[in-house]
């Protein structure tokens, strides 16, 4: 089984821990919760991937916006064939700021206008951690405009190396940009701050109130991904993540909003491997 699909096994293995986090709220119906699978680490074709996640019971997938018409046709054909939803990931790796921003804008513009199946949302790897506030704000301004025009929710991911790489930095962005919406991958912050964030409770509470989408990976104080969340040594870490996610779920239920969750478990070598085996 590929690492992309192993997420399903890991999530099912967390049932015991989740049952201890009994909460007095639940979604009204299945359509209010969309569980998506990642193709990160999957080595087959798009069609093969869609077959696999459909079989595992996923509602859809999150993928990078396809860069060519051929890839777009391939993806949208598979989504239609297997009746799957989609969320798009947009971002840029260019070093030069102007080039980086331009590439990002082109992806956002394409993803909000050139689709055959309207995405549930767009998730952004926005800016860089070393760009200035004003430089990074340009990414927020563009996505705000694009979201308003298209009606597609656009979220900015809490991701290392990107604009929202740390909790306190994100707080500053939220205070200055109250309409900012987040994709919560809090595993990154556990790594960045080398903690389970107990010393930033008010900041985390503010961030959770802005979450539209979740990446459900479990990080820890020394890395962005535990080796196996079912292992007893990660019990406290798993519970911390479940509590953060439950806070988002409670908010979504209260507001009558749909929640999307991407199950994510990084492949080798993101997942550490034995020395001398690669």
What kind of region is each of these model predictions?
Residues 92-106, 130-132, 139, 225-235, ...:
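Surface-exposed, active-site-proximal loop segments in enzymatic domains
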Residues 96-181:
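Active-site acidic/histidine proton-transfer and metal-coordination neighborhood
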Residues 22-39, 46-68, 105-132:
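Long, low-complexity, intrinsically disordered polar/charged segments
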Residues 1-20:
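N-terminal export signals
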Residues 25-28, 50-55, 69-88, 103-118, ...:
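Acidic (Asp/Glu)-rich catalytic clusters
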Residues 41-46, 60-74, 93-103, 128-135, ...:
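Acidic-and-aromatic substrate-binding clefts and catalytic sites of carbohydrate-active enzymes
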Residues 22-29, 47, 52, 110, ...:
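Histidine-acidic metal/acid-base catalytic patches
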Residues 29-38, 61-63, 84-91, 120-124, ...:
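Hydrophobic faces of well-ordered beta-strands that scaffold small-molecule active sites
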